[in-house]
């Protein structure tokens, strides 16, 4: 007959064996812990504070490539810099794009003669004023290098899916990203004198926006301030007291200034259009 001491020892041994059958030590050294080895061979989960590795946008297990603001797979093993952008193809033209801060802009002005639905935008005609929305085009034979000036009536009817006319707030964010309205102008303007008159002050084009001194079309269709001014429309309006005319906010850059200013302009004028990518 087993003594009480031997019986206790036997029961304890059975209990210990039973516990050993149920317990285990995870890869982090924790009994019954929840850590495990992922596909990259790293101990994750449980109390490690680590999450398992995933396949990046370049197809690399545990890679560090990611989609940037232009939805382009960059960094990691791609050998593509983080600020790279793919071109936008629209209506037979390939547009350069550029990342500035958290925004993606066209790096050149819009050059379409069609509305978004595919219908043709009427050319401006001094003898037949078109109320449906005018497109003003400089008289150049080379379609690749023509300058397009759009009336405000065309806004929101000429942009491809995923892109839009910028808001006043979009432009304010752009200006702030570049240090404020007193120094942002030079960073946006094309350097040199191919399109700008002397002195084209402080122009560096350091962010790749490549604003050209195109001037604008006045209410009569005449080209004004070519070489001395660049501006583009926003979609936001300003109602002027005692005026029947609608004014739209525009970004204005000048040949003799480093400023980048938001100023209201008449909807009857013709300005270039610069698109921003939807968030």
PLM ranges: what are they?
Residues 2-98, 138-139:
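Primarily marks secretory-pathway-exposed extracellular/lumenal segments that are disulfide-
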Residues 70-71, 76, 82-279:
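Conserved positions within compact, well-structured domain cores
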């Amino acid at each position: 007959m087993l003594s009480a001491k031997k019986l206790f020892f036997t029961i304890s041994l059975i209990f210990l064996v039973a516990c050993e059958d149920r317990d285990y030590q995870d890869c982090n050294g924790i009994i019954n812990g929840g850590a495990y080895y992922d596909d990259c061979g790293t101990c994750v989960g449980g109390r490690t504070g680590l999450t398992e590795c995933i396949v990046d946008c370049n197809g690399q297990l545990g890679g560090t490539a990611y989609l940037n603001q232009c939805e382009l797979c960059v960094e990691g093993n791609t050998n593509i810099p983080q600020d790279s952008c793919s071109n936008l193809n629209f209506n037979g033209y390939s547009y350069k794009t550029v990342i500035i801060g958290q925004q993606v802009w066209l790096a050149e002005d819009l050059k379409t003669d069609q509305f978004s639905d595919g219908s043709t935008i009427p050319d401006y005609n001094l003898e037949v004023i078109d109320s449906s929305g005018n497109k003003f085009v400089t008289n150049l034979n080379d379609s690749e290098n023509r300058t397009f000036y759009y009336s405000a009536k065309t806004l929101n009817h000429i942009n491809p899916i995923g892109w839009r006319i910028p808001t006043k707030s979009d432009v304010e964010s752009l200006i702030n990203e570049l240090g404020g309205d007193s120094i942002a102008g030079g960073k946006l303007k094309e350097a040199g004198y191919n399109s700008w008159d002397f002195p084209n002050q402080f122009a560096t084009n350091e962010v790749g926006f490549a604003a050209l001194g195109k001037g604008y079309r006045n209410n009569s269709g005449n080209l004004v301030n070519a070489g001395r001014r660049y501006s583009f429309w926003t979609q936001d309006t300003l109602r002027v007291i005692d005026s029947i005319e609608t004014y739209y906010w525009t970004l204005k850059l000048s040949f003799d200034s480093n400023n980048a200013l938001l100023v209201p302009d008449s909807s009857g004028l013709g300005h270039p259009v610069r698109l921003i990518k939807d968030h």
